[in-house]
Amino acid sequence: MQRDPGTALVLFSGGQDSTTCLAWALENFERVETIGFDYGQRHRIELDVRPYLLERIRTDFPAWRGRLGGDHMIDMAVLGQISDTALTRGVEVALNANGLPNTFVPGRNLLFLGFAAALAYRLSAKHLVIGVAETDRFSYPDCRDDAVKAIQLALNLGMEKRFIIHTPLMHRDKAQTWALADWLGGEALVKLICEGSHTCYSGDREHRHSWGFGCGTCIECNLRAAGWEQFRSCKEAPVTAHEMT
């Protein structure tokens, strides 16, 4: 595979999707840096596992080690202060009247991509990589393809740059996300994502399942578990390089 000689900045939360996207970026770009956001999320454990994941990628994947650069953590406490959601308040996860779960944090990805672009501007990084998808049962408005394209246009107009926002998972479900990780880094990466990444909205690191740690009952745990089972059941099916790009 011929890699882009430029620099990519990956929005890296410490979850399954962003870890997979980090591997994708390391396979596709010569230089990769990461950015994370602390907005007071109730599942803050995802931020705590980030250093472990970055270190393991450096030690376990020699081909990627030299391409993985700096990590940047941004304090976004103000987002948690103005958001009344299940991810920023101690309330039970439920559906809102508009059909979206109350785990939706309005404006989150718009702000994340804006701050990431500001950092990318300083780093002279043209590429932004984010693990959003519109294939989940609940597709958040700021995770949809048309929203991301609109954000890219706004950033380019507002900064007079030519950023490209890459969304490797946009049209992939969770089973296909597991398959992409397997294709990129083999069983070693799949195992690292299982053991090291965190997706559970409850922040549960006590209960270990075949697909990783979590409460096993929240929306994200259910999606991750279902995707894992489908991925393992289809593991023997051949996968082409075209399907993974």
From Swiss-Prot:
CDD domains xrefs: QueC-like (cd01995)
Cofactor: binding comment: Binds 1 zinc ion per subunit.
Record's protein name: 7-cyano-7-deazaguanine synthase 2
Cofactor(s), names only, from the UniProt record: Zn(2+)
Annotated ATP binding sites: 12-22
Enzyme Commission numbers on file: 6.3.4.20
Function: Catalyzes the ATP-dependent conversion of 7-carboxy-7-deazaguanine (CDG) to 7-cyano-7-deazaguanine (preQ(0)).
Keyword ATP-binding: yes
GO biological process: queuosine biosynthetic process
